[in-house]
Amino acid sequence: LGDVYKRQVSTIIRIGRAEKFIIAMSELIQRLTVDHLHIVGDIYDRGPGPHIIMDELMAYHSVDIQWGNHDVLWMGAAAGQRGCIANVIRICARYGNLDILEEGYGINLLPLATFAMNTYKDDPCECFKLKGNPDYNATEMLMDVKMHKAISVIQFKVESQIIKKNPGFKLEKRNLLHHINYEKGTIELDGKEYKLLDKNFPTIDPKKPYALTKEEEDIMERLERAFENCEKLQRHMHFLLNKGGLYKVYNGNLLYHGCVPLKEDGNLKSVRIFGRAYKGKGLYEVLESYVRKGFYAMDPKEKELSLIHI
């Protein structure tokens, strides 16, 4: 029997199929060893290549996913939620991963890049330097930091609109642009005045600090269409919807990403959603229902309200 195996291996090597054979055997071992795969969140957490990971997971024989906050952020962006779109681009810019959007998903960032280079032409954007060590040349680095600043300002504006429409979120303190003295380059918080590290905000009108300029509005309209119409992104996000959720009970184990709101004594804390209080399992289930409605609801108002909670 040993000679038979030796001849088989020799033949595989002789006909140049050794590498393919090793890969096939490795995949077989993996398949027999791992019966079912649990992905406990944040496939899209700042690192490179999430689109490649998603392609691999979609080809996997048995998998479930517990959504992380970064996954839900991308799902919201794919559904056209502007706050999520701006946040996704900002994070990609900050960590030098804009190629995920441009090359991985074919989303056109040229309008944003052109706007950023023109608007912040002479601005070094020191406060918007990239995290990590992206493989960029000097020109790419310069463009990325300017895009990072441009989309950050846009994010502040679009998120403020969401906060104003939803006082129940109690996030008014996150709206800070109206606290800035743009002439002095200072901001007043809780009665104290602080100097800003960055004082160049050419797209902010002190009288209407949260209003998008015409160029910013045009950019967001284009990006919204690009995210909603990207076939590959939609395919990946629907896979997350079909195979995932905010939690899963499997073999007596509770799987979830992130945290559950608790009181100081360790008991479950209630959170109000549209005037109703939810906690623990009920909170997770109602939030998950809004994520799904954000994709599948036919009523535009219901869809918009659901996307706000993403």
PLM features per residue range, with description:
Residues I162-K207, A211-M220, E224-I308:
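Extended, H/D-rich, highly charged conserved domains that either
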Residues V4, I53-L57, A78-I91, P261-K279:
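Short secondary-structure boundary/capping segments
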Residues L1-L32:
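Low-complexity, highly charged intrinsically disordered N-terminal segments
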